[in-house]
């Protein structure tokens, strides 16, 4: 079975890992980084993803960041006259990670385990699955981020019984889950969280502070200037990271705006204590779900054996201190908060392929599920923190005499009134035979699969007529839309590939022109006028082709010039060899001459010898 990669699709950064042997390995992207910014930029018809997209966020208005916050909604991004759904933007990030994995493995990748915040509802999970499909990935499993982190942490500790609290504060979401680990079983006891709280919010309090201070000093509101705001965002993110290691940082943004007297510069010193004061309400917001998770699991803080911190925002010292104070123990420092989720997803991929044995993952549904009943109330069928997959049925009846149909309004949430909860979908069971109210027996069944995705069935027990629905929220995509987006993604990938090839070809051709000019100059009188003229002619032909748009012509002219330069190089090489041979022959002759010694001779008189 082919490899199943693990992907942490994050709000600000994403990460991809694969199981090698028994160990999960994080795959570096082409820039050599282990995480990739979840940023997509559109420029001159080209799509760019990752660091290259993030770098142009200040100057390019067609840059999309933190799209994960809009998953499962009907939000759209309008770029260059075209609308993109959050699923399509996320698919571009996933496709980039898929390409990274394929380059590393040297093989096609089409299966993945993708993580989501534990507190993601059904619509958000379905949107994530759709994004994977658009990117050309078969999503084998959607698992919760804290659960994935616990898998990576506990893989080599299967012989120990532990209760672990995972505190996951990412770029845009916050989750806390409590798991019980033992004998290879990873059982989630409870989960809680806040889908609208993350590192972006910590950046925002710094941005608001900088805007306020600058306005006080200069009377200019930077929040109305889009380009200034992006510079502030980058500076705030950097300052937040700096303050995890130092107690004070300098924020310097020259020419941030202009006033009547000329350009204005922002120079502010931000201390860690000031940042902690600004972020205090956000940190306190993380404590309520933590207490809720403990309460739902029926545990006290003293029963927690280990605390695992996940997500880049847990590097903030005040966050670590708050967790330590609440739970009463130091957090575990043995995992990388940016990479541990992707590693856990890769382990789950190994479980699916059979490469990891004796590991069982028992996850839970984060929110209660039910339907609307008389009086606008919500009747819960499946309580939150129920282990999945699961199924639950309940029998209802009609509210009026001879009622021909019933509306099933499917809800997710914890509030008693239907209107205060999230609507997952609506459908109708029709053709109910005429009968007094309360007589028809309508059985409603909720089924949640291992990915946390809901299927609902309504059945008239009198006629056995059945109607079912796989929940499709208002933001969900139809199969036709997904197929169209898959096709678009493939075409874009092909177009991007062609564009890259064209850029590479033009760069190679430019380089060749320069090389030929240099070679002709260096050789001087060592080449014949005929060869020189031929090379010049082919070089000029290539330069002329480069000014046009005919790629095939550039390719042909480049090949012609390459042949000329090869022939020229061969001739020069032969000349050099001949010259070297002649030099060696001359040196040998000189040496032979110098080896002839002048001999002394004496004239011999034969007559005298005979005497």
UniProtKB/Swiss-Prot annotation:
Gene3D superfamilies: 1.20.1270.10, 3.30.420.40, Actin, Chain A, domain 4, Substrate Binding Domain Of DNAk, Chain A, domain 1. Residues 574-591 have a biased composition (Low complexity). The lineage of its organism: Bacteria, Bacillati, Bacillota, Bacilli, Bacillales. Acts as a chaperone. Residues 529-542, 599-611 have a biased composition (Basic and acidic residues). InterPro entries: ATPase_NBD, Chaperone_DnaK, Heat_shock_70_CS, HSP70_C_sf, HSP70_peptide-bd_sf, Hsp_70_fam. PANTHER family: HEAT SHOCK PROTEIN 70KDA. Induction: By stress conditions e.g. heat shock. Belongs to the heat shock protein 70 family. This is Chaperone protein DnaK. It comes from Staphylococcus haemolyticus (strain JCSC1435). Keywords: ATP-binding, Chaperone, Nucleotide-binding, Phosphoprotein, Stress response. The modification Phosphothreonine is found at residue 173. GO terms for molecular function: ATP binding; ATP-dependent protein folding chaperone; unfolded protein binding. Residues 525-548, 573-611 are annotated as: Disordered. Signal peptide: none annotated.
């Amino acid at each position: 079975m082919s490899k199943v990669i693990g992907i942490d699709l994050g709000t600000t950064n994403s990460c991809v890992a694969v199981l090698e042997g028994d160990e999960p390995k994080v795959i570096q992207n082409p820039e050599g980084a282990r995480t990739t910014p979840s940023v997509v930029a559109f420029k001159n018809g080209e799509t760019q993803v990752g660091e290259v997209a993030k770098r142009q966020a200040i100057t390019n208005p067609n840059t999309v960041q933190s799209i994960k916050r809009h998953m499962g909604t009907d939000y759209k991004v309008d770029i260059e006259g075209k609308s993109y759904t959050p699923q399509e933007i996320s698919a571009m990030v996933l496709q980039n990670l898929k390409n990274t994995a394929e380059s590393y493995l040297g093989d096609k990748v089409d299966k993945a385990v993708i993580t989501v915040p534990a507190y993601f509802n059904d619509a958000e999970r379905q949107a994530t699955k759709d994004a994977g499909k658009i990117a050309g990935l078969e999503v084998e499993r959607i698992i919760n981020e804290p659960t994935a982190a616990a898998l990576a942490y506990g893989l080599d500790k299967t012989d120990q019984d532990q209760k672990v609290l995972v505190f996951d504060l990412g770029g845009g979401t916050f989750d806390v889950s409590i798991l019980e680990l033992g004998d290879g079983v990873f059982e989630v006891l409870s989960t809680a969280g806040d889908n609208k709280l993350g590192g972006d919010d910590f950046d925002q309090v710094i941005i608001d502070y900088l805007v306020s201070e600058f306005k006080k000093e200069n009377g200019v509101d930077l929040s109305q200037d889009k380009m200034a705001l992006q510079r502030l965002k980058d500076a705030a993110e950097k300052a937040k990271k700096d303050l995890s290691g130092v107690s004070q940082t300098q924020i310097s943004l020259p020419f941030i705006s202009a006033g009547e007297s000329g350009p204005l510069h922002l120079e502010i010193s931000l201390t860690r204590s000031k940042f902690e004061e600004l972020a205090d309400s956000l940190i306190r917001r993380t404590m309520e779900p933590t207490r809720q998770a403990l309460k739902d699991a029926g545990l006290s803080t003293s029963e927690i054996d280990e605390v695992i911190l996940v997500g880049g925002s847990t590097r903030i010292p005040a966050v670590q201190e708050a967790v330590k104070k609440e739970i009463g123990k130091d957090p575990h420092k043995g995992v990388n908060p940016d990479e541990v989720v992707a590693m856990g997803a890769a382990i789950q991929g190994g479980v699916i392929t059979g490469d990891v044995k004796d590991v069982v993952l028992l996850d839970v549904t984060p929110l209660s599920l039910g339907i609307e009943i008389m009086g606008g109330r919500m009747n819960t069928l499946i309580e939150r923190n129920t282990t999945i997959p699961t199924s639950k049925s309940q029998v209802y009846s009609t509210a009026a005499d001879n009622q021909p149909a019933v509306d099933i309004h499917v809800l997710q949430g914890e509030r008693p009134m239907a209107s205060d909860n999230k609507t997952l979908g609506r459908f109708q069971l029709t053709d109910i035979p005429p009968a007094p109210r309360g007589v028809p027996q309508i059985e409603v069944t909720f089924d949640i699969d291992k990915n946390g995705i809901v299927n609902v069935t309504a059945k008239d027990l009198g006629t056995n007529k059945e109607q079912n629905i796989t929940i499709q929220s208002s933001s969900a995509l139809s199969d036709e839309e997904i197929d169209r987006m898959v096709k678009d993604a493939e075409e874009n990938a092909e177009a991007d590939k062609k564009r890259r090839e064209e850029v590479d070809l033009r760069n190679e051709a430019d380089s060749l022109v320069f090389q030929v000019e240099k070679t002709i100059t260096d050789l001087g009188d060592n080449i014949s006028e005929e060869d020189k003229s031929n090379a010049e002619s082919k070089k000029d032909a290539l330069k002329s082709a480069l000014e046009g748009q005919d790629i095939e012509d550039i390719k042909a002219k480049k090949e012609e010039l390459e042949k000329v330069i090869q022939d020229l190089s061969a001739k020069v090489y032969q000349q050099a060899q001949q010259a070297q041979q002649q030099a060696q022959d001359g040196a040998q002759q000189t040496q032979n001459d110098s080896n002839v010694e002048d001999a002394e001779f004496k004239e011999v008189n034969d007559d005298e010898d005979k005497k």
